[in-house]
UniProtKB/Swiss-Prot annotation:
The lineage of its organism: Eukaryota, Metazoa, Chordata, Craniata, Vertebrata. It comes from Mus musculus. Signal peptide: none annotated. It is present in the adult kidney, testis, limb, ovary, brain, small intestine, salivary gland and harderian gland. Isoforms 1, 2 and 5 are detected in skin and keratinocytes. Isoform 5 is found throughout the embryo. This is Formin-1. Pfam families: FH2.
Length: 1466
């Protein structure tokens, strides 16, 4: 991608939106977008700010998670182990990258305008140590690309920072080729240089699948790192065994003993690293005035420049002697989840004895390869490389053993690692003014990083970092020269191995190196000793920054985490919190090892927040000169060539802001031993306000002015149209899939609910059927049960009264049973007496469910007890005894019976007594219902009482002093006892009788005190003929027995299906016709045989003819009739039966067609005659009417008069009739009337005359108006013929033919009339042939009267047809005569004059003329009426007669006269 912006100090920074897509040979195209801004501070130090921009749907990661962005795992709160494992999985797709992607770092470093591709000058204070740049002239020629190197040759000139032009892939390949050619000659110089790789603060969620490619010269051969193979053993099986995969992360459970990074030089390493080393050296030489940043080590001030150079020279020589290649040394930098406050310091200690100091052994967590620093080192032993090659052929791992480490650490100090010159130069030039940039850009960042550069000992002293901070320390072993003292604090440390494969770490760390955004080193102001937290630590989410990129960060919650690679604010950038990446004196690359990664727990990290709180993402620092197994040589050369000119330092993390350009610095060998420490400080986020309050005084830049927060970044579109459409399609597809899923779920749930509903419904229906069956059985049993009320009182008082029972129903008459009474006496049970009021409580006349005899109560203490003999259900119907009829129905006004209690416990029931009517004998009424007695124990023989047949026991006497309440309906004080049954036996009629609703009186024989009544002595006679009585008074209806359900089901099953032979639609049509006929087939047959259209009209006959059975249908029906039985014929559907019966009429189709044609012919010939007659009448009217000629002559006169003096139009003898419709458009001068109005008025005034006979004859029988008109017009009587004006009278006639006739005549076409006549003639002949066929084929009994009627019709039809033909010919001749008579010519484009043209002209003119003629006739009538009235008034005025008015009320004669007149009129 081409750089398209220029960073100017006088303008706001220009933000650029970049999109980087990656070529993955085995996957889909992925990419990411970021916005970057390159700005300068007042010292011309450039730094870059980047924000990730999310476009379209999430990019599918390599872990087969379709909805997860490749970098999204950084934003999730996952343990570091899982993050690094995910990094390991991503390496499988990072083998082949496009060169164009790797060259995309130039975007951030190129300025626009007419600056000739040069970077702006960098104002850097460099040290004056001449020992640093002894071979600066030799380094200058090795800078691959950049105008910076050309500028570095002038050491007396202040180094400026300028952009370089982008280089095409061809140029890069050529440069790599050149470097390869001269790399062998200059390897000595390059081995003495330091190389630095900018690592990226990269989150897994934000980064796409990228990888860094290294130069071929940096590939490390033969087991350079011991931990790579060990880590490779724990790799997932699905990861390809690529060089990168072999260097992938292994198990986090490994101890830190695997951190030994030793190995021999690779024999196939490319010598092109010399050029890279020269670049690093040139970078140093161009920044001599940079003051060094002292290290926390005690030996920070004891390294001399000459010693470092000599050590570097010896290292280079030893490398050339071994294999002319340079190995690598890697320093673990750091890794952290986006929200994890972890601080790490990679610290390399120089031990004189080659010992390496390490931290605690507890920290063995995964570290990305970008967190390791690769330093070209000196000689290494190669005996461990064979071991690696045996395990993994073709893959060069970095392994080492303890003896190798010992030998390597004792290497002379001259073997100093080379450093990328351009990156060092950029690092030295990045002296930022934090306050200026933070306010100018509107960002509040809590990331600061200050880089220190090599300097002389006398120029600067280094302070220890603040002890208040916690950090991670990675001790880097190095070989110290003889003059350089070793730090005392590191001499006693153990030597564990590197926990991860460094090559894999590097390969997995910077997938966005092609983006080339600046890395921000994390300052480490903390104490170098802090406890390590748990290995799988969780990281807190950080609040979003109120900056320009906040909108972008807000798109995902994880983007709100502050990152240390942003713009450093004025308060956060302090010298105390620095990131130092220093080389070791004479340390071989393999002896330089990352000892330990210390993780600080969240509590410890949060407690250590000070003024320099820093939040750092995983900064994977990868020097361009990495020599790991997982990097191809060619790709690495491209990477080196790209990282060299990256003065702005690309931040490789989309969505985070970059700080100073380089993550850490590799100082030269000549520096103090304190510069061999790498501090990476990771602190939680701290708001800018806190740092503003705690940061000591920092000067703010006057220019450029600070950038307000409201200033919007001017960028282009963040997405392309194709991406937008792709996102829309993706969302639509997701929406559609979601809708389909919801619909499927809904249908499934509906199906389940319907199934459950059907199941519940079936169960309920089954329960209903069971209840119905139970109810039916119980109803059948209720007919044989009754209620039995038994008194259970023990006192047997003598009875002092008798009961008189009144029988109200034949069926309810109770017969006393002696057997029951005997059985009751034998059982010594005396029932209590019941109130007689309960005898009135009985069901309706037809109800037989409950029957209970009631018992009169003698006192308020007695109560009624009734029981049922069978076991009682919830609503038990008791069984009555065979000889006891049911009680009478309830009288009106009484409530229902109390429910019967169950059998075993005899429950007392106290019914409320009714109000007592006034009895003839004084009986004291009861005050209320008495309390019921306690229930007696169940009786063993109670169940046998109703059917025992024994007489009931005598009722006990009531207590003295109390009388029972009188029963309702009794006119005397007699009461009946339920224990005493009626005297008369029950009568059982042979059939149910109508009830006689009387009030029954029953007399008790044992009652002694009652007075004798009629009923005692009255004897009931015997009915002699009961059959007659039953016949007369029996019930009309009887209950029908219900049929069993089995029979009903059997009948339903036996119903046979109706047979259909026709198509469904056809059968429906015939069925509709049958339902609309309302006729029987006999009527239809008779109407057809007799040709009678009064019964079957023509429309019905036509419908029958159209819906008659076709041949195939008729064949099916006839075949079915022939092959089926009579029972099956009844099952045939009605449409089929109807068509079959219709087909039974002989020659139905021919007969129907003849009858239909007879009606059609009559209508057709009548229509033709009417049309011909209209044309003939219109033509003759125009030819023979004198008034038509008068009107045309009048128009001719007016036209010639109007055209007088005009030689072309005047003096006309005639005119074309086309002018007639246009006369109404000729207006008068005042527009009050037109020419047609004037013609009509003139005609009515002077032309409307007619001859009449004598005026008297003309005036006879006229009304007063005619008389007035006659008198006014003709005052003198004249006899004989005379001419007079009739205008305005009823005698006035319209002078033209009727306009409607002209309109109808215009619709006639002679061609159509001729066609209709010919059609009728053909149909007539065809119908005649059908008649002959009918007469030939039909039986003789069906010929008459069809034959006679049809023959007569055809004779008449032929005559009428001939007459209409002659009439049509006459009409045509008359029309042609009319056209010629008026001189009309055909229309333009037509050959003949058509009736429509001629008659439409006359129709329009006649319509206008008739409208005006009616109006003017009315006006003339009004004028003549006025004249007649004036004449009459004049005559009456001359003959005045005085008349006396008579008062009708005063004169008796007048009243009589009026009365007579009224009577006569009536």
């Amino acid at each position: 991608m081409e750089g398209t912006h220029c960073t100017l100090q006088l303008h706001n920074p220009i933000a650029e939106l970049c999109y980087i897509s990656f070529y993955l040979p085995k996957g889909e195209v992925r990419g990411f977008s970021y916005k970057g801004t390159v700005t300068l501070d007042r010292s011309n130090n450039a730094f870059h700010n980047c924000y990730q921009v999310r476009e379209g749907p999430d990019i599918t990661s390599l872990s087969q998670q379709p909805n997860e962005h490749p970098g999204d795992i950084f934003f999730k709160q996952t343990p570091t182990k899982n993050i690094l494992t995910e990094l390991y999985k991503l390496t499988a797709e990072k083998e082949r990258l496009l060169d164009s992607l790797l060259r995309s770092d130039n975007i951030l470093g190129v300025s626009m305008g007419s600056q000739e591709g040069k970077l702006q000058e960098l104002s850097v204070i460099l040290a004056t140590g001449d020992e640093y740049f002894q071979s600066a002239g030799n380094w200058r020629r090795e800078l691959p690309v950049s105008s910076l190197i050309r500028r570095s040759t002038q050491e007396n000139k202040k180094p400026r920072r300028s952009g370089r032009r982008r280089e095409s892939p061809e140029e890069l390949r050529q440069k790599r080729t050149r470097r390869k050619g001269r790399g062998c000659q200059e390897s000595a110089f390059q081995m003495g240089k330091d190389q630095v790789c900018s690592s990226s603060s990269l989150s897994f969620r934000a980064r796409p699948n990228l990888r860094l490619l290294e130069e071929r010269g940096n590939l490390v051969p033969r087991g350079t790192l011991t931990s790579s193979l060990r880590r490779r053993e724990s790799c997932p099986a699905n990861i390809l065994r690529t060089p990168d995969a072999d260097l992938a992360f292994g198990n986090s459970g490994r101890t830190s003993e695997d951190t030994d990074l030793e190995g021999p030089l690779s024999p196939d390493s490319s010598p092109t690293e010399v050029g890279d080393a020269d670049v690093g050296g040139q970078l140093k030489s161009s920044h001599q005035q940079e003051p060094p940043q002292p290290n926390v080590s005690e030996s920070h001030g004891k390294h001399a420049g000459a010693e470092r150079w000599s050590s570097r020279t010896r290292k280079s020589k030893s490398l050339e002697r071994t294999c002319s290649k340079k190995p690598v040394s890697k320093v673990v930098a750091k890794i952290q989840e986006p929200s994890a406050p972890v601080k790490r310091i990679v610290r390399a200690h120089h031990d004189g004895k080659g010992r390496v100091a390490y931290g605690p052994e507890t920290q063995t967590e995964f570290i990305p390869k970008a967190d390791f620093l690769t330093l070209p080192g000196g000689e290494t032993e190669t005996h461990s490389s064979g071991r690696l090659e045996e395990e993994q052929p073709g893959i060069k791992s970095l392994r080492s053993s303890a003896p190798e480490r010992a030998s390597i650490t004792k290497e002379p100090a001259s073997t100093e690692a080379a450093v990328n010159k351009v990156l060092r130069k950029v690092i030295e030039s990045e002296k930022l003014d934090e306050a200026t940039e933070g306010k100018r850009l509107g960002f509040s960042l809590n990331t600061r990083a200050t880089h220190t550069f090599p300097e002389t000992r006398s120029q600067r002293k280094a302070g220890l970092p603040q002890s208040g901070h916690k950090f991670l320390l990675l001790d880097l072993p190095h070989t110290v020269g003889p003059d350089s003292p070793q730090p005392k604090c590191d001499e006693k440390k153990p030597t564990p191995q590197v926990p991860t494969a460094l090559g894999m770490v590097f390969n997995n760390s910077s997938p966005q190196s092609s983006a080339h955004k600046r890395l921000s080193p994390v300052p480490s102001p903390l104490s170098p000793r802090c406890p390590s937290p748990q290995q799988h630590h969780r990281i807190l989410l950080l609040p979003p920054l109120p900056s320009e990129g906040e909108v972008v960060f807000n798109e995902y919650p994880s983007r709100k985490n502050d990152v240390s690679s942003g713009f450093p604010s004025a308060d956060t950038l302090e010298p105390s919190s620095t990131t130092k990446v220093t080389e070791t004196k004479g340390a071989s690359p393999t002896s330089l090892r990352a000892s330990q990664t210390w993780l600080v727990s969240e509590e410890a990290s949060e407690k250590g927040l000070g003024p320099e709180k820093i939040t750092a993402p995983p900064q994977h620092q990868l020097p361009p000169g990495i020599a790991s197994e997982g990097f191809p040589c060619d790709n690495f050369k491209e990477q080196t060539a790209k990282d060299l000119p990256n003065k702005d330092g690309g931040v490789w993390v989309p969505g985070y802001r970059a700080g100073p350009p380089c993550p850490f610095l590799l100082h030269e060998e000549k520096e103090k031993t304190s510069r061999s420490e790498l501090y990476l400080d990771l602190n939680p986020d701290q708001s800018p306000t806190e740092q503003d309050d705690r940061t000591p005084g920092r000067l703010q830049a006057v220019w450029p002015p600070p950038k307000t927060k409201d200033t919007e970044e001017k960028v282009g579109l963040k997405y392309t149209e194709a991406e937008y459409q792709a996102a829309i399609l993706h969302l639509k597809r997701e929406h559609k899939e979601e809708i389909e899923t919801l619909q499927a779920q809904f249908e499934l749930k509906t199906f389940h609910i319907r199934g459950e509903h059907a199941l519940v419904t079936a169960r309920l229906e089954e329960a209903i059927e069971n209840l119905k069956q139970q109810l039916g059985k119980r109803r059948e049993g209720c007919e044989e049960m009754r209620d039995v009320c038994i008194s259970t009182d023990d006192d047997c008082s003598p009875k002092a009264f008798r009961n008189v029972c009144i029988q109200t129903d034949r069926e309810t008459f109770l017969k006393p049973c002696d057997a029951e009474s005997k059985a009751t006496r034998s059982s010594q049970i005396v029932p209590k007496k019941l109130t007689i009021s309960l005898t009135q409580l009985s069901p309706s006349k037809d109800s037989k469910d409950i029957h209970a005899p009631f018992q009169t109560r003698e006192g308020t203490s007695s109560s009624s007890q009734h029981k049922i003999s069978p076991p009682a259900p919830p609503t038990p119907p008791p069984l009555p005894p065979p000889l006891i009829p049911p009680p009478p129905p309830l009288p009106p006004g009484l409530g229902p019976l109390p429910p019967a209690p169950p059998i075993p416990p005899v429950c007392p029931v106290s019914p409320p007594p009714p109000p007592p009517p006034p009895p003839p004998t004084p009986v004291p009424p009861s005050d209320g219902p008495p309390p019921p007695p306690p229930p007696p124990p169940p009786l063993p023989n109670v169940l046998a009482l109703p059917n025992s047949g024994g007489p009931p026991p005598p009722p006990p006497p009531p207590p003295p002093g109390l009388a029972p309440p009188p029963p309702p309906g009794l006119s005397f004080g007699l009461s009946s006892s339920s224990s005493q049954y009626p005297r008369k036996p029950a009568i059982e009629p042979s059939c149910p009788m109508k009830p006689l609703y009387w009030t029954r009186i029953q007399i008790n024989d044992k009652s002694q005190d009652a007075a004798p009544t009629l009923w005692d002595s009255l004897e009931e006679p015997h009915i002699r003929d009961t059959s007659e009585f039953e016949y007369l008074f029996s019930k009309d209806t009887t209950q029908q027995k219900k049929k069993p359900l089995s029979e009903a089901y059997e009948k339903k099953n036996k119903v046979k299906k109706i047979i259909k032979l026709l198509d469904g639609k056809r059968s429906q049509t015939v069925g509709i016709l049958i339902s609309s006929l309302h006729l029987e087939m006999k009527d239809i047959q008779q109407a057809i045989f007799t040709v009678d259209d009064s019964v079957v009209d023509l429309e019905t006959l036509a419908a029958l003819y159209e819906n008659r059975a076709q041949e195939d249908e008729l064949t099916k029906i006839r075949k079915y009739y022939e092959t089926s039985k009579e029972e099956d014929l009844k099952l045939l559907d009605k449409p089929e039966q109807f068509l079959h019966e219709l087909a039974q009429i002989p020659n139905f189709a021919e007969r129907a067609q003849c009858i239909i044609f007879r009606a059609v012919f009559s209508e057709g010939i009548t229509s033709l005659h009417r049309k011909v007659e209209i044309v003939t009448r219109a033509s003759k009217g125009l030819l023979h009417m004198k008034s038509v000629k008068d009107i045309l002559a009048l128009i001719l006169a007016f036209g010639n008069y109007m055209n007088g003096g005009n030689r072309t139009r005047g003096q006309a003898d005639g005119y074309s009739l086309e002018i007639l419709p246009k006369l109404k458009d000729v207006k008068s001068r005042d527009n009050g009337m037109n020419l047609v109005d004037y013609v009509v008025k003139y005609y009515l005034r002077y032309y409307d005359q007619c001859k009449h006979h004598d005026q008297e004859a003309s005036c006879r029988g006229k009304d007063l108006f005619s008389l007035y008109f006659h008198i006014a017009v003709h005052p003198q009587r004249k006899s004989g013929l005379e001419l007079k004006q009739e205008a305005g009278t009823d005698k006035s006639v319209f002078p033209l033919p009727e306009p409607q006739d002209f309109f109808l005549a215009s619709q006639v076409k002679f061609e159509d009339l001729l066609k209709d006549l010919r059609k009728l003639k053909r149909q007539l002949e065809a119908s005649e042939q059908q008649m002959k066929l009918v007469c030939k084929e039909s039986p003789r009994e069906y010929l008459q009267p069809f034959k006679d009627k049809l023959e007569e019709f055809f004779k008449k039809a032929k005559k009428e047809h001939k007459m209409e033909e002659s009439h049509l010919e006459n009409a045509q001749k008359s029309f042609e005569t009319t056209v010629g008579y008026f001189g009309m010519k055909p229309k333009t484009g037509e050959k003949e004059v058509t009736p429509s043209y001629v008659f439409m002209v006359w129709f329009e003119f006649c319509s206008d003329f008739k409208t005006i003629w009616k109006r003017e006739s009315k006006n003339i009538s009004k004028e003549r009426l006025k004249m007649a009235q004036a004449s009459v008034s004049k005559l009456t005025s001359e003959k005045k007669v005085e008349t006396k008015k008579i008062n009708p009320t005063a004169s008796l004669k007048e009243r009589l006269r009026q009365k007579e007149a009224s009577v006569a009129t009536n």
